[in-house]
Amino acid sequence: MGASPIFYLHSMHEGVQVSSKLEQLQALLAPVVEGLGYQCWGIEYVSQGKHSVLRIYIDKEGGILVDDCEAVSRQASAILDVEDPISSEYTLEVSSPGMDRPLFTLEQFASHAGEQVKIKLRSPFEGRRNFQGLLRGVEEQDVVVQVDNQEFLLPIDSIDKANIIPSFD
């Protein structure tokens, strides 16, 4: 059958304002989370007018309990009240990444190579924004995903959202 084709998406820097807001929130909140003894798995900020949501995903060996989320929520709320990086109203959510954990960093993508993933891009590539397939790994700044018999190299900066698809085998 031969080698499967490889497609490469060149990154276009859309959503820079959102990205810099996320970077600002990450820089502010990651030290708080880590100072409490947790790993800051990732942060999502979804701005939807009056219904904006700030999600902080935390993890630790042995898993996360409700008390862990509560402790991080209290500390994060305090620092957010003082620093006020979000001018509009928002809801703060703190949770574990869960079974369908979101992936944010190249290291997270690399550590979950071999698993099924669902990836949504910020803008279409090859006429599509959604990719579901086997996570092959990473190459430099690209996430490699195999959909059917095709490999796609997707720059991490072009990914809007990515999640593991849980396996119940």
Curated annotation (Swiss-Prot):
The biological process GO terms on file are: ribosomal small subunit assembly; translation
User: What InterPro entries does this protein's entry cite?
Assistant: Ribosome_maturation_RimP, RimP_C, RimP_C_sf, RimP_N, RimP_N_sf
Function, in words = Required for maturation of 30S ribosomal subunits.
* Presence of keyword Secreted: no
Query: What protein am I looking at?
Result: Ribosome maturation factor RimP
From the UniProt record, report the name of the gene that encodes this protein.
rimP
Q: Is Transport a UniProt keyword of this protein? A: no
Q: Which organism is it from?
A: Pseudomonas putida (strain ATCC 700007 / DSM 6899 / JCM 31910 / BCRC 17059 / LMG 24140 / F1)
Q: Which family does it belong to?
A: Belongs to the RimP family.
Instruction: Specify the superkingdom.
Output: Bacteria
GO cellular component assignments:
cytosol
Keyword terms of this UniProt record: Cytoplasm, Ribosome biogenesis
Q: Where in the cell is it found?
A: Cytoplasm
